[in-house]
């Protein structure tokens, strides 16, 4: 049954996605039906991404790994580094891995509806699924890359603290933040085409405005307080605190949690009001 649905996804405009029997995946509009379709779409994204690649899964690891090695070399071997903690390579990876997830997801949000316009118009499943499939597929790639974090934690002699228990909380908050952000960005990019290029520029600036190659505590006043209101600062703090307890910053964590929830609800509200406009533009 899943094979039939997946075949339907491979052909643009094919309606077989919605022909899966209710007995197998639930009645139309049911959570079970939604989750089943979400999984099929996410699995398709992963399959397409790696089907023509000789390295396959390794690509989800190479990007953050190469970035980490470059920054480690520049800031430890070329220039004197005054920020971050030791082992610095582990310090980098704990933030770069979730950043790659965030960056890849937001980049794909800008094409979420235009890429599969015919399916978006013709299928009966809720259209928010075209955003959530990106969050899920990129999130799975993030989870696949975690062995790199474990390997460097062992090789670099990193120590584990109680904060590691907050790692799942960070994943949950980032998922909520991305879903809300996607429900805002995706429809707006259909209505205003220039927003796709604008988003790329914002992401480039956001990388350096987010505590990745440095920590929140490394910033001088008043930039430390300003940075705390970047929701990614609090989320990335939760990822790091399991290996670097001194990186804990209550203000940034609270702000990250609150903003993630607010953006999620704002995204749902925005999407409901823009959905008709999106369908007219597609």
Feature locations, PLM:
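Hydrophobic transmembrane alpha-helices and immediately adjacent juxtamembrane helices
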Residues: 1-282
């Amino acid at each position: 049954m899943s094979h039939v649905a997946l075949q339907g996804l491979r052909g643009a405009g094919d309606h077989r996605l919605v022909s899966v029997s209710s007995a197998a995946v639930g009645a139309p509009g049911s959570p079970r039906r939604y989750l089943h379709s979400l999984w099929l779409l996410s699995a398709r994204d992963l399959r397409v991404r790696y089907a023509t690649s000789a390295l396959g899964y390794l690509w989800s690891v190479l990007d953050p790994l190469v970035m980490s090695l470059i920054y480690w070399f520049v800031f430890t071997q070329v220039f004197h580094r005054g920020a971050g903690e030791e082992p610095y390579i582990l310090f980098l990876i704990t933030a770069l891995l979730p950043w790659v997830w965030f960056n890849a997801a937001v980049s794909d949000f800008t094409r979420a509806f235009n890429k599969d316009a015919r399916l978006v118009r013709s299928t009966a499943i809720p259209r928010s699924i075209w955003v959530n499939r990106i969050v899920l597929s990129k999130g799975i790639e993030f989870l696949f890359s975690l062995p790199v974090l474990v390997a460097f934690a062992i090789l670099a002699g990193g120590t584990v603290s109680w904060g590691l228990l907050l790692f799942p909380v960070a994943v949950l908050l980032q998922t909520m933040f991305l879903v809300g952000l996607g429900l805002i960005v995706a429809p707006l990019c259909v209505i205003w085409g220039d927003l796709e290029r604008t988003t790329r520029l914002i992401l480039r600036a956001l990388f350096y405005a987010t505590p990745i190659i440095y920590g929140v505590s490394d910033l001088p006043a008043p930039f430390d307080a300003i940075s705390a209101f970047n929701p990614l600062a609090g989320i990335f703090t939760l990822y790091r605190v399991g290996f670097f307890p001194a990186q804990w910053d209550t203000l940034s964590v609270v702000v990250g949690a609150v903003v993630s929830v607010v953006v999620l609800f704002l995204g749902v509200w925005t999407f409901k009001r823009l959905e008709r406009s999106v369908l007219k533009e597609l």
